[in-house]
Amino acid sequence: MRTKRIAQGVTATVLAFLLVLLTTGASGEHPAEQVRGNLDGQRVRVNLPPTTEPKGVAIFFHGQGSNYNHKMDGTWLDALRRDGWVVASSMFHRENWGNPISTEDTMKLWDWAEQQGGGEVKLYIGASMGGTTSLNALVHGERKPACWYGVKPAVDMSTMGNVPGARRFISQAYGGQPYPRDRNPVDTAFKLAKTGATFRFVASPRDPFVPYESNSGEIVSRLNQFGADVSLRTVQGPHDDPSHYSAHDLVAFANECAGTSD
């Protein structure tokens, strides 16, 4: 096991060095520096900020049908990186719908991302299905970040009938058995509130796939009831409408929540 970890570390270091050589600009900033790796069969990556003293590590959780590259090369998450954050992602066993193995994947990524980035994990970011994956990691994981940010988050698996293939993927994720109630975030609002995390939801009432009222609307109401620090930003447009992806809102929340504002 130790030999395997050393080998992974050497491979990651070589990749990082090569990417630095390829991407360092005249200013010395590394706008596209990445480290990629493989943790027990799951591809992972981190995007590194242009500083040796990062503000923290943010872990991004992809949605159904996506992978560890989702949003990682776009301007939304890159705004966080340019502000001084390490941004990490994983395959998380693809269509995991927050099952136990995805929580194990999160803990492995946590350790690896901190090692590669030189900062502490402070923020989870969940998109669509990634809302369930990240919130379940928050409840069931050995370690918990102080901050959580969800975009169009799916948090009630019983309401995913309009998401193509979701019912089949959810069944497969839980071995053909009904998902446990303690893996359905809307039903774990009390436990989520007790983590002490600060929550930010971004969702649209016009989302045709993830119903607003029974997902973001309902869980925000329950979190408020249980005394959590939670806010909701309502946007317009369908499920992946650009209005969801405000770089300013993401960066401002991350820094305010983590206490890392300049």
Regions found by a protein language model. Give the residues of each.
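Alpha/beta-hydrolase fold nucleophile elbow
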Residues: 117-128
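Glycine-rich nucleophile elbow surrounding the catalytic serine of serine-hydrolase chemistry
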Residues: 126-136
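Short substrate-entry loop that stabilizes the transition state in hydrolases
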Residues: 54-55, 63-98
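Alpha/beta-hydrolase active-site loop
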Residues: 96-117
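C-terminal catalytic histidine-bearing segment of alpha/beta-hydrolase fold enzymes
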Residues: 63, 71, 214-262
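The feature captures the conserved acid-bearing segment of alpha/beta-hydrolase catalytic domains
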Residues: 169-217, 221
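Hydrolase active-site cap/lid region
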Residues: 103, 135-178
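N-terminal cap/lid segment of alpha/beta-hydrolase-fold proteins
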Residues: 27-51
